[in-house]
From Swiss-Prot:
SUPFAM superfamilies: Alpha-L RNA-binding motif, Nucleotidylyl transferase. L-tyrosine binds at Y31, Y162, Q166. One of its GO terms (biological process) is tyrosyl-tRNA aminoacylation. Its EC number is 6.1.1.1. Homodimer. CDD domains: S4, TyrRS_core. A motif ('KMSKS' region) lies at residues 222-226. It is found in: Cytoplasm. It comes from Chlamydia trachomatis serovar D (strain ATCC VR-885 / DSM 19411 / UW-3/Cx). GO terms for cellular component: cytosol. Catalyzes the attachment of tyrosine to tRNA(Tyr) in a two-step reaction: tyrosine is first activated by ATP to form Tyr-AMP and then transferred to the acceptor end of tRNA(Tyr). This is Tyrosine--tRNA ligase. Keywords: Aminoacyl-tRNA synthetase, ATP-binding, Cytoplasm, Ligase, Nucleotide-binding, Protein biosynthesis, RNA-binding.
Amino acid sequence: MQQLIDNLKKRGILDNSSAGLESLTVPVSAYLGFDPTAPSLHIGHWIGICFLRRLAAYGITPVALVGGATGMIGDPSGKSVERSLLDQAQVLDNSKKIAAALASYLPGIRIVNNADWLGSLSMVDFLRDVGKHFRLGSMLAKDVVKQRVYSEEGISYTEFSYLLLQSYDFAHLFKEHNVVLQCGGSDQWGNITSGIDYIRRRGLGQAYGLTYPLLTDSKGKKIGKTESGTIWLDPALTPPYELFQYFLRLPDQEISKVMRTLTLLDNEEIFALDERLTSDPQAVKKYIAEVIVKDVHGSEGLAQAQAATESFFASKGKSITEAELVALVESGVGVKVARADLIGKRWLDIVVELGFCSSRGQARRLIQQRGLYINQEPLADEQSILDGTQLCFDRYVLLSQGKRKKQVIDLN
């Protein structure tokens, strides 16, 4: 364990750890949780997936927990307002998809679902056997609770109970699967230490915790969000091209944190890339984008992203071919719409309807600034409509927002 701790410190991704953790000897097991609050994992989850892979490389047996029960409650950590509760059917469906994704990214890993033990726990048993081990004073002192209790939004008893449920998870895995270490982002430290204390109070033994820094920008906002929404790992929600472009567009100062947390590149290569950032940041970002897209979507996904990039950003004067447009649509960088649904509509309405612009206000500003392009020509009139003369090969339209954001409309 000491080697892992040293590596994480050197890499700069060790946030907090329990006293005595470095003295643990392998083999040991460690777990990390993924709540199924959506049908897909997002780029923030990739930090945890990389972390589990890193644990395995050091001889630690990784366990992934899908929060089929806790996902119905909602973790208040890092949230200023309460999450909207999902219905049971949605959580069940999300859980299956998250488990399948984890199995594909982490072949052979043990995947557990806390609905298997929390789902059958009665309220009376929970209060009697779990609640009695927790003191309100220490719970209220936790940062995540303290921040919400005194906020205008407050915190519900439902969210307040999340800490107890996560602690019970840790104790269950400790007892049933000999999992002695829980890992997570820095916002999970309070929940993790509560679990360690709960395990001790029950007389089960000594447990440990370890956290890594959250991936945030210079303003403290979590990386992985765009104006269009979340960056998902499911290629049907965020195509490989969009994932690739996301990392190319990141500010230069953010890429150093990205390559430490979202890749398994060794520390020596990371430090060499740090030096290269000062002289050729775009080349470093391109390389890191390639590494991550290949890791998430495989060689085929990377090839799609590269081909789409080549098609969209071809040298000036080079026309995009029909084959390239077809490939872009098939790779997810496009949307198929019935011709009758769009012909004759204003572009101002179309770009909002397709989610290419967040609002008509944004679309108007882009048009006024000559930043919205139809087939590589700036749209000058907000009253302009889509007609048959704008179709490439009598079927396609290439939308562009500035230099980076692109989309193909396939009027099939």
